[in-house]
């Protein structure tokens, strides 16, 4: 599950912090559109104004109804919301699933707002914890279990299966391993895993929409056991996908693995974004800026912050005992994102597809250990094997 990056200027090549928002976009209900200065805003105007035209055109198009699928009446949860792509939520959601009391729970599990007080206590710090031998063994165990749970989800992915059904299987797989599904009630996230289909970048909420032939879907798993979190995700093909989807998914996985190859003591965390963006751009794709990799151990999200785009300002140098995730989100079109009114589902602003892969890594004395590595198929992800 990705960490949220602070907003950066949307002007191509500018990575300054952005606090100014386009007033026309606000009026039209277009999310995002942040710039660092009037100069950058004016310099981007020629391309940026096309967003305004698209939003106006969408409002005058005759309405079609995406809310009926195979005789199943779906409730539109946000009437009037302008979707960027073809995907629609399929509501109502099922209630939040219970977790047996005998399973150890993270501090946010029963908080009314899902707030992690242990994370809040360290918010803003850039100090990166060096894990003890005991901590490292705990991380190895929980990451192995997280990998097993993702394997259960992988067997579920096929046309006609709903992401809600995948979530149910994930929930049961966590419970059977005496694990708490870390996303559940994390800042009130309502499900046990994230399922992100097509134009969804990350944090998609599982619902009753059946997967369709040609979809791509990312399943993001985090589990909590004995005080530690283990986090990973993969993007899967649903049935037969087009060549564009294959190129996107393959490139995204290559971005992750090329970054992992550079992980070793002495490397600056900011360097990973340079590696990822170089490979993505060489293949005609863009890199999401709003969501990042993160430190993980007894806390779900903590230092370091690990942006995936070039010329970022991430703080920190890798040392043995650091544990963190790399989880690049790569897009067919532009990197700009919006969020559905559910407050979680991040989607591409242009409605084009996005893919993601994630591993949890331990920095060793000479390189790194992939804690969430797949034990079968020589470690290859499911889309290859």
UniProtKB/Swiss-Prot annotation:
Which GO BP terms, alphabetically?
proteolysis
Which residues are involved in binding a protein? Answer: 203, 301
Q: Which residues bind Zn(2+) 3?
A: 220, 231, 358
Protein localization: Cytoplasm
The protein's annotated catalytic reaction(s) are: Release of N-terminal amino acids, preferentially methionine, from peptides and arylamides
GO cellular component entries: cytosolic ribosome
* Alphabetized Gene3D superfamilies for the sequence: Creatinase/methionine aminopeptidase superfamily
Q: How does it assemble?
A: Associates with the 60S ribosomal subunit of the 80S translational complex.
Q: What is this protein called?
A: Methionine aminopeptidase 1
